[in-house]
């Protein structure tokens, strides 16, 4: 999965917008692209190093996902109770990555719509 294909997938979900809200904090060292639904984040990643994504996750599914996939672990700068990171190009198939992103989108959309 490449960065543009992933971005297009995220933007294809209803009501999704994107932004780079953390530029002032990174001081040019990196750029985090964030995807929002209803004004709330559901996915983000470092544009300069598209090797992992961070997404919202149902807390009840986290343990099983982390046990099943080595590429799923602690989030990059997120609450470990609600977020996971997925390291791309490892043991999580692209279809599963898209499914996890869709689940993240639904979790956030349901809460804030």
What are these regions (language model features)?
Residues 1-113:
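Charge-dense, helix-prone N-terminal extensions
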């Amino acid at each position: 999965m490449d960065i543009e294909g992933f971005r297009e997938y995220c933007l294809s979900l209803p009501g999704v917008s994107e932004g780079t809200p953390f530029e002032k904090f990174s001081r040019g060292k990196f750029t985090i692209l964030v995807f929002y639904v209803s004004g709330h984040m559901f996915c983000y990643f470092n544009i300069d190093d598209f090797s992992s994504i961070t997404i919202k996750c149902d807390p009840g599914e986290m343990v099983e996902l982390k046990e099943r996939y080595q590429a799923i672990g602690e989030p990059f700068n997120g609450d470990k109770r609600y977020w996971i990171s997925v390291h791309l190009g490892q043991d999580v198939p692209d279809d599963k990555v898209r499914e996890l992103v869709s689940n993240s989108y639904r979790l956030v959309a349901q809460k804030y719509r």
